[in-house]
Amino acid sequence: MRRIALWMLCLALALLCAPVCAAQGEQASLRIAASADLHVNPAYRTTGIVNPLEPYHLQLVDAFMWDAKQQEADILLQLGDITNQGKRTQHEALIEKLRQAEAQGMAVYVLPGNHDIGEVSTGEFAGLYADFGYGEALSRDVESLSYSALVGDTLLLLLDTNGYSGHRDTAFLTDGTLRWMEGQLSRARDMGWQVLCAGHYPLLTSNSTPFSGKERAAQLLEDYGVQLYLCGHLHKRCVTLGESLTELVVDQAIAYPCCYALIDVEEDGFRYEPQATAVSEWAAQRGEADPNLLDFDAYQTRLEQARCAGVVARLKGEQELTAQEQREAEDFFFKLSDYRAHGTLSRYAGMLREHPGCDIMIRIGAGTIYSRWIPSVLSDAVPYTTGFTLQGGKIDTLASPQAQP
């Protein structure tokens, strides 16, 4: 509670010192840096088969938190799967990093994902993260790890969407949790608070886990005029529009291209912009000697190209491809992955459909998920993944620099 009081004091002083025009109607915004799926595990000794950047994931967590501070974030929001297996040692390693972020002046809020309750119970989880949301909650749900927190005139409604049945991928929201959720929304409406809701599992996108209570939760948010729901779980940025609710699946800050979400809470809405972590700048100011960290963009691009080439090779198997066809397939698949990761896929979807490597990938991927996934990803691309503003339930795309085809 002390750090929120400090934040409010700083905000009050800033308002007192602000120009007269600010006193005539402008509202100081609250800036939130959000990420999901950090999967912290100090014992990682992998070659990065699932995520090529896994060997550097602890450094990338540090770089992300440092970058968030450089972007003047007030709040660091972690949307679940903050550890890899829910082991106490993993939680303790993350908590040490969160304390460092807090010491830099950022308030920290966490919620659990499907990987976070393992060796620790739900009660132990809340105790471990008492300084990062649970000990400062305005209200806590008695049936889950859901809670709310009030920051200024913004209510953070943080949902625990995980089911604790012993099966990692089970998810649900109980009737009791939904009643608690509606109570928080009703209170916010009565008090005139703006609501930002978040959870680990998506509620709107069709590309995620179906679970009990999902549709009812989304409808509650629509009914109470909530404009934005943040989540993770998919490890890839995704924007899905409801009737008046926008869902943003935030980036995984430890995987290519190492971005996170910057959310500005404004007077009647939100502004979202993806932010690339300046890993090389972080490494240089820390005096790191590792050349991969010091030229990180080039390093992670090489790894992503190699990963995409590996996918092509596995799909090809014993099938006959000329050297030119293989190069075209690799070029297509890397561009598809790269544009999707950077949020520019809708801009280049038409070009990629005409790319000679597109038909080759679908052909060699026949009978696999890729033959369905590639057309689906190209058709589902939306322009809002480069950033957007929300005002009164209306979404507008932020202008973004043109990527290189």
What is the predicted role of each segment?
Residues 8-16:
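Bacterial N-terminal signal peptides
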Residues 68-75, 155-157, 168-248, 322:
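His/acidic metal-ligating clusters that form di-metal
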Residues 41-44, 84-87, 112-121, 164-167, ...:
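Active-site environment of divalent metal-dependent phosphoester hydrolases
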Residues 23-27, 284-405:
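Non-catalytic terminal accessory segments
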Residues 29-45, 153-164, 196-198, 245-251, ...:
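Active-site-proximal beta-strand elements of phosphoester/diester hydrolases
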